[in-house]
Regions:
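Extracellular glycan-modifying ectodomains
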Residues: 1-384
Length: 384
């Protein structure tokens, strides 16, 4: 009888402590100001949604409020670290969509294409190319690390077959768009550091190998191996995949830039929508920030106009994602002007640019993962 009474008291005490702890966390969550950004994850955090009856009925409000609570929960970074530690002890090799590969190599999962968006994008690109019959239109899809560095994948990992996905896109685009294959060249160098260990981007070395493979299609002739010299600009880069997975946060990597050895490198970069100009393709101030990859062009912008002193008369329209940012410096000696558009941020249409900038060539340069989940290309390339 006495033992039963003691057990009930203990159970009640545990219940009271649990309720008080939960109540304390709720109070702290109300008092502590919301954070705008997670430095550890290198992303913006969800903000408190505005209440509207229509969004409540549709379920949109509940979804956004849940995301808000997940992002703004007090001690989130600490709990996240604890979860990663427990997962690793339990043998998990996949954390928040990131494979934890051999020798600490992090590899982002291969995205599955949204069939409707992909079909709309391909249709828009084909229609655009057919409407510009006198201008060469080229497509260069860059395979993601999980597709190339298959020797670094954890055992039993079975990512989507991105090679097959590329083949389907190439077939659907048909002859109206010239396909530039860089996958073969990157696979030849898979044992070299062509992708960062802690980030989803290729390294500048990987971009250079791709440039060498693409050069003949772009009308760039000769041996390019001795025409650029590399310089290290950072040895403390810790990329997005480390932030996303919570793994290898202490890993430090080198970022290199490649500079032409012979050509005149004078140029002007016009950040059209931002209303600013630069005489460099690099923004060294970004090396003091978390995402040091943004040293290339200062990060992503909606529209750039790069004017060079090249003797060439060619004017390139480059439609791209962030993989192109470290690729563009290889192109500048060979084009008089390069107009760079990122459809994720650009609100106009391509037809607005073709005549204004007297474009003579068009190149699409995307990583596979970005291309297969993109829902912006079809809008930007809508043929009027």
């Amino acid at each position: 009888m006495k033992k039963d009474r003691q057990r009930k008291v203990q159970e009640q005490l545990v219940g009271i402590i649990f309720i008080l702890t939960l109540f304390l966390f709720l109070i702290i969550n109300v008092i502590v100001p919301d954070r705008e950004k997670s430095v550890q994850e290198n992303r913006m955090l969800a903000t408190k949604p505005k209440f509207r009856l229509s969004s409540l009925i549709s379920g949109d409000y509940d979804e956004k409020f849940e995301a808000y609570m997940d992002d703004q929960f007090v001690g989130r970074d600490m709990w996240r670290k604890l979860k990663v530690t427990v997962d690793r002890i339990g043998g998990s090799r996949l954390e928040n969509g990131v494979y934890i590969g051999m020798n600490g190599q992090l590899l982002e999962q291969i995205e599955v294409a949204d069939e409707n968006h992909l079909a709309a994008n391909i249709k828009a690109i084909k229609s655009f190319s057919e409407s510009q019959s006198k201008i060469p239109v080229r497509m260069m899809l860059v395979p993601d690390a999980a597709n190339v560095l298959n020797h670094s994948l954890p055992s039993l990992a079975k990512p989507e077959d991105q090679t097959q996905m590329f083949s389907m896109v190439r077939k659907d685009l048909g002859d109206s768009v010239e396909w530039i294959d860089v996958s073969t060249e990157l696979n030849k160098h898979k044992t070299e550091k062509i992708y960062y260990k802690t980030d989803h981007h290729w390294t500048t070395l990987g971009a250079f190998y791709a440039f060498q493979a693409a050069a003949p299609s772009l009308g760039i002739e000769g041996d390019l191996s001795g025409k650029y010299v590399s310089y290290a600009v950072s040895d403390s880069f810790n990329g997005m995949l480390a932030s996303k997975s919570g793994v290898n946060l202490g890993e430090k990597e080198q970022i290199d830039i490649y500079v032409p050895t012979e050509e005149d490198t004078d140029l002007i970069v016009d950040y059209v929508d931002e209303g600013k100009r630069s005489t460099s393709l690099y923004d060294s101030s970004k090396l003091k920030e978390k995402d040091q990859y943004t040293v290339f062009l200062g990060g992503n912008s909606s529209l750039l106009d790069i004017r060079t002193v090249s003797t060439s008369t060619k004017r390139l329209l480059l439609v791209k994602d962030s993989f192109a940012n470290s690729f563009i410096p290889f192109l500048t000696p060979y084009y008089r002007e390069i107009v760079v558009v990122d459809p994720r941020y650009y609100s106009g249409t391509i037809n607005d640019l073709m005549d204004s900038y007297r474009i003579s060539e068009v190149l699409f340069l995307y990583s596979g993962n970005t291309f297969f989940k993109d829902n912006n290309i079809s809008g930007v390339f809508a043929v009027e």
